[in-house]
A protein has these predicted regions:
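Short, low-complexity N-terminal leaders and the immediately following helix N-cap/first helix
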Residues: 1-81, 333-357
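Helix-rich terminal scaffold detector
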Residues: 1-19, 180-307, 311-317
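Structural signal for hydrophobic packing residues in well-ordered secondary-structure cores
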Residues: 26-33, 51, 114, 157-163, ...
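Flexible glycine/proline-rich
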Residues: 19-22, 36-41, 50, 93, ...
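Short, glycine/charged-enriched hinge/interface segments at domain edges or termini
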Residues: 2-13, 52, 69-232, 368, ...
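Conserved active-site and cofactor/substrate-binding residues in soluble primary-metabolism enzymes
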Residues: 13-20, 35-38, 42, 66, ...
Length: 417
């Protein structure tokens, strides 16, 4: 007699690992090539299309790191206080207009260009001043409190590499080097749609058996956070003909199509067959939990990623697969999120052969930080994402996790705005 399964993941068969799926994405997806020039004020989050080469040193000149007195170190008496007349003043943007003479001190302020003839700055807190003369204590090293031209960035350096997603510090560096505009890749145009006869827009009447569409709004936010221009194509019914029409229309005007729902093996799941009718399906089942049914294909030459219908599986598969696809397509490099080793504050058993992503929060336990698993594992429990800090990742080979074992932790802050 056949054994009935009580585990929806029991009949996995030969499934792709997420590493294999990511390699497929790397091989099959080519970045956009169109660029545009934008002012710094609106460049945050955009992908830099060309290296920024420094055309100047940063800082552009030697300058003082503190408020104090600039002197020539050779003029200081090694074993006792040195008294010097203060004969000039240098402030940021108002440098001394002559070389400093031997045996004199120049009053200097933070950021001011070092006067010619000086090489050391004595902090004002370490000095005594009386009757126009400053007393400088012995023992200061030559070059103290002096910032050198080019110690941050040297002329000719690659200050920012192409492929960088521009953050606030990047824009500051670009501005400090005199750039008012930057060449960036144009934003991706992404078509987004949900599938399912049971799915309704929020606020609409909700008949028995229907649910409100959470996925489209989560995905829209995640896509916008990656700088995409999103076309919301709404909810499409569970009919192959309707999906074929929607996908064909979307492929004509977009760089990427993202769907949720309809990628499993049920009689009402038609995304897979629609993609096969219109183009090519590269894969559609992965050895991960949650999120086994995930489709990657092409429709009219446009990449399509079909995500599951359960909202937790949508989040996990987006972060694991869709996000790398989008960053590659957008021209971004070095976008792999950081994983952090933490101690497991829980025990857990899993089936070998699939990678699992467990929702967890970080808690302090003595001097250590531990990951505590959310109590319920269901792929439809959206509140588990809201109330967790990130995902504990258990590799395919793992079968049992004991308390105190080091695990990889992916914070949501690394991958979600």
């Amino acid at each position: 007699m056949a054994q009935l399964s009580d585990d929806c993941y029991a009949n996995d068969g030969a499934l792709l690992t997420d590493a294999t799926a990511l390699a497929e994405i790397e091989e099959r997806v080519a970045p956009v090539v169109e660029t545009e020039t934008v002012p710094l004020q609106v460049a945050a989050g955009r992908i830099l299309a060309r290296d920024i080469i420094a055309t100047m040193n940063l800082p552009p000149h030697d300058n003082s790191a503190v408020d104090g007195y600039a002197v020539a170190h050779a003029d200081l008496i090694p074993d006792r206080d040195t008294a010097m007349p203060v004969t000039g003043r240098a402030a940021a943007g108002r440098p001394l207009d002559r070389p400093a003479r031997r045996g004199e001190a120049i009053r200097i302020f933070t950021g001011a260009a070092m006067p010619e003839g000086t090489d050391t700055v004595m902090m004002q807190e370490d000095c005594a001043f009386e009757a126009g003369r400053v007393l400088l204590k012995p023992g200061i090293r030559r070059g103290a409190n002096r910032r050198h031209a080019g110690e941050d960035i040297t002329e000719g350096d690659v200050a920012l590499p192409a492929g960088q997603r521009l953050r606030a510090p990047d824009l500051g560096l670009a501005a400090a080097l005199g750039n008012r505009e930057l060449c960036v890749f144009r934003p991706l145009r992404v078509a987004l749609l949900s599938t399912g006869d049971e799915v309704r827009d929020p606020g609409a009447p909700l008949p028995r058996g229907a649910i409100y569409d959470a996925n489209r709004f989560m995905l829209g936010s995640l896509l916008a956070g990656l700088g995409c221009v999103v076309s919301d194509l709404g909810i499409r019914p569970d009919r192959e003909a309707a999906l074929i029409d929607a996908l064909a229309e979307a492929s004509a005007q977009h760089d990427l199509i993202v769907t949720s729902g309809g990628v499993s093996t049920g009689e009402e799941d038609h995304v897979k067959s629609a993609v096969e009718r219109l183009g090519t399906l590269h894969f559609w089942r992965l050895a991960i939990k949650p999120g086994r049914p995930v489709a990657l294909g092409q429709v009219g030459g446009v990449p399509l990623i079909g995500l599951p219908g359960n909202p937790v599986a949508v989040i996990v598969t987006f972060l694991v697969l869709a996000r790398p696809l989008i960053t590659k397509l957008a021209g971004a490099t070095n976008s792999e999120p950081r994983l952090f080793p933490v101690s497991a504050g829980f025990a857990y058993r899993k089936k070998p052969g699939r990678r699992e992503y467990l929702r967890a929060s970080l808690k302090r336990s003595g001097d250590a930080v531990v990951a505590v698993k959310y109590a319920r594992d269901g792929a439809g429990i959206l509140s588990s994402i809201v109330r967790s800090d990130g995902l504990v990742i258990l590799d395919e080979a793992a079968s049992e996790l004991t308390v105190g074992t080091l695990v990889d932790f992916l914070p949501f802050s690394e991958v979600m705005g």
